[in-house]
């Protein structure tokens, strides 16, 4: 893989950029302090802005590593982060990345997450040269699965009691897209966009 690190990506409505420590108040206010956002995630709700600040200190310190990918999701009309998306696992030999994301509830059901996900997937395939992009979700959080399907990812199955999140031991539904499948996947994405399906998180 040709690692590029976290470079700025622009879409129609979004700027995906590196976090700065100055983003801590927005991170805390817009999503990290909301238990509804973290319900099916693996990290606890932030109890103070200081926790958000410490997380961002850690992330910003890792940006010098070209294998570290963590973007702030910034709507152009707002100008501050409303969520995050990044690579939570990568495998050099298999040439794959696993993507995780979260976004504040005020921005659910507007297609923001899928727009960010599609942009990061394109970046991983075109710039980094991965062969496989994958992600997973708790089946009790079906809107996350809709994000993956909207981006053309294929459902590969649900592994029973194979994962853990803030609800405890849970099932995990897996989705993935291979480089060789992208053309057909883009046809699916175009169809969904034509039909204006935006019922994701």
Annotated model-derived regions:
Residues 38-58, 69:
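Conserved GNAT-fold acetyl-CoA-binding loop/helix
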Residues 58-62, 123:
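A generic secondary-structure signal
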Residues 31, 41, 63-64:
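Hydrophobic residues in alpha-helical segments
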Residues 1-26, 30-36, 70-201:
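Acyl-donor (CoA/ACP) binding surface of acyl/acetyltransferases
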Residues 61-67, 153:
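Short loop/turn motifs at secondary-structure junctions and domain boundaries
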């Amino acid at each position: 893989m040709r690692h590029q690190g976290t470079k700025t990506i622009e879409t129609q409505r979004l700027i995906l950029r590196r976090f700065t420590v100055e983003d801590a108040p927005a991170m805390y206010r817009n999503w990290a302090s909301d238990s509804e956002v973290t319900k099916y995630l693996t990290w606890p709700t932030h109890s103070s802005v200081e926790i958000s600040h410490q997380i961002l200190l850690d992330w910003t310190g890792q940006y010098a590593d070209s294998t570290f990918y963590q973007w702030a999701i910034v709507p152009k009309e707002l100008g501050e982060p409303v969520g995050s998306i990044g690579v939570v696992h990568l495998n050099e030999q298999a040439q794959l990345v696993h993507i995780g994301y979260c976004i504040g509830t005020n921005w659910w059901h507007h297609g923001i997450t899928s727009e960010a996900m599609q942009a990061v997937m394109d970046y991983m395939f075109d710039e980094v040269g991965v062969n496989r992009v994958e992600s997973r979700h708790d089946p009790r959080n079906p809107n996350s699965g809709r994000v993956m399907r909207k981006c053309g990812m294929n459902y590969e199955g649900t592994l029973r009691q194979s994962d853990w999140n803030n609800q405890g031991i849970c099932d995990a539904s897996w989705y993935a897209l291979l480089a060789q499948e992208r053309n057909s996947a883009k046809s699916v994405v175009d169809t969904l966009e034509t039909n204006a399906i935006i019922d994701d998180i």
